[in-house]
Amino acid sequence: MKQHAGIRRAVCAGLAVIWLLLVPLWTAGAETSGAPDYAQAENWAYFSDGEDRAADVFFICPTVYGGADQAFNMPMEDQKARASFLGATNMEKGIYDESCRFYAPYYRQAGLSVYDLPEEEREPWLALAYEDVKAAFMYYLENRNDGRPLVLAGFSQGADMCLRLMKDCFDDEATSGLLVACYAIGWRITEEDLRQYPHLRMASGEDDTGVIISFNSEAESVQDSLLIPAGTRSLAINPLNWRTDATPASRQENPGACFPDYSGEIVTEIPHLTGAYIDPVRGSLKVPDVSPADYPPGLSLFSEGVYHLYDYQFFYRSLQENVAVRLNAYLRAHAAR
């Protein structure tokens, strides 16, 4: 028990350092910069990293910019913000880069302060962020893809941006035929979204392709959050047993929770940390075997028991394995054509 308590303290201390990096960004006053030119290498956190891989991943970073009175979107020239952006990308890069050549654009993401606004008032700043993401994606598609299999991936605001790309750019066969899968983790997608965009398909197992993988982790007691407001049902798949119903996965099915630092190095790995099951009412991913006190929300946007910060970390090895499984399924299917 003492050993586990020490691990938890180390993990939480590391995460506290990460979130403290946001503090100076929150108060820095700067006007939002102009649109980036994605033909310039400086506007990419990663551009074609891992040339020997069989596929590409286009990864969209989560929110790291706090926001300021004069700048609700991250200024591209803000070097502290770029350093945090790169660090947050590194924390999730290892899930994908064993299988994929890695692309990750810097973009004028909406600051955390935007999420304090009512939902209908957030859109101008999120729309600006999406302008950059789409421009970067189109540059990649037109200049670098060359028919290669594609994994689309993001977390939190990055997942929101992934879903916007899926709605906007994957309704034609040429683009959708490239898609191995879209890992849009840490944001909601609903039945209404699927009705409005019938070309979208949710994953139904561990190896289907051209699909969306999504979930939002929380304690069993949570009934409302920024990510899944009360009365909303999100669509999800369990990242341990790859079921979409409420069938629980035990902690023994979890090959490893991993907690990387800003370099991407895994500081702590805990096999069998927790199981998970999908709440049939909320569509959230309930995480029963950890304590909210040991894994605090980290941001005032989230109440106790919202495990948003840990969506990738709790299920790191399972997600890493699944990227390879889906890519192999895609390659087999396309080799047979």
Language-model regions: role of each:
Residues 24-30:
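Sec-dependent signal peptide cleavage junction
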Residues 145-154:
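Alpha/beta-hydrolase fold nucleophile elbow
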Residues 56-60, 102-106, 151-152, 181-184, ...:
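Structural recognition of the beta-strand scaffold that forms the well-ordered cores
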Residues 36-104:
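Short, surface-exposed "cap/lid" segments of acyl-processing enzymes
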Residues 3-15:
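Bacterial N-terminal signal peptides that target proteins for export
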Residues 13-24:
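Bacterial N-terminal signal peptides
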Residues 154-158, 162:
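Gly/Ala-rich beta-loop-alpha elbow adjacent to hydrolase catalytic centers
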Residues 129-146, 168-329, 333-337:
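Surface cap/lid and interfacial helix-loop subdomains adjacent to catalytic sites
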